[in-house]
From Swiss-Prot:
The gene is yjjG. Optimum pH is 7.5. It comes from Escherichia coli (strain K12). Keywords: Cobalt, Cytoplasm, Hydrolase, Magnesium, Manganese, Metal-binding, Nucleotide-binding. This is Pyrimidine 5'-nucleotidase YjjG. Its cofactor is Mn(2+); Mg(2+); Co(2+).
Length: 225
């Protein structure tokens, strides 16, 4: 294995992130049956907020509260309380993706392993502990704590500084979102691997080093490279 460091995104790269199920579970505590239509309405608000967050236009707190503002008004609850309940629900239901544990075992001892995530601090540590994967990772970099999000090159520069400034030609970034994980890795001068499990069309102007459809495929690839 030619890599000194392999960095992963977290959500939908190493861990499942079924936000619909998490929201359904969370809203049960408020006697609300959260429907597919409700989820569509939620995503219509949530997705643009994530784009704004990744572009540095809003803070993590504005994102976390903004996505629940309409529900907070309906339920007469603080949006921060709904957000906290959602994160707790997600921590309970998140599991490693198929092939994640096998892949981490294959890498461990051959390269150092890190996470660079745009997710939020409250979820990351709890999820790593609950899934039993905490000890696999040498470094955990969370955008909320750094103050910038992928694809901003600064979060990658920060991660590499924390990693001891390894040779960037010997660092690989793996993620499922081309517009943040892969573009950011490219901007930082890293090799990249796009986990494209849903066979999305490759965005124009973003050219990953490799593209795989599963973590099993990535493990096989790393055995050769």
């Amino acid at each position: 294995m030619k890599w000194d460091w392999i960095f992963f995104d977290a959500d939908e790269t190493l861990f499942t992130f079924d936000s619909f199920t998490g929201l359904q579970r969370m809203f049960l505590d408020y006697s609300v049956t959260f429907t597919a239509e409700d989820f569509q309405d939620y995503q219509a608000v949530n997705k643009p907020l994530w784009v704004d967050y990744q572009n540095g236009a809003i803070t993590s707190l504005q994102l976390q509260h903004g996505r629940f503002e309409s529900w907070a008004e309906r339920l007469n609850v603080e949006p921060g309380k709904l957000n906290e309940a959602f994160i707790n629900a997600m921590a309970e239901i998140c599991t490693p993706l198929p092939g994640a544990v096998s892949l981490l075992n294959a890498i461990r001892g051959n390269a150092k392993i890190g996470i660079i995530t745009n997710g939020f601090s409250a979820l990351q540590q709890v999820r790593l502990e609950r899934t039993g994967l905490r000890d696999y990772f040498d470094l955990l970099v969370i955008s909320e704590e750094v103050g910038v999000a992928k694809p901003n090159k600064k979060i990658f520069d920060y991660a590499l500084e924390q990693a001891g400034n390894p040779d960037r030609s010997r660092v690989l970034m793996v993620g499922d979102t081309a517009e943040s994980d892969i573009l950011g890795g490219i901007n930082a001068g890293l090799a990249t691997c796009w986990l494209n499990a849903h066979h999305r069309e490759q965005p124009e102007g973003i050219a990953p080093t490799w593209t795989v459809s599963s973590l099993h495929e990535l493990e096989q690839l790393l055995c050769k490279h």
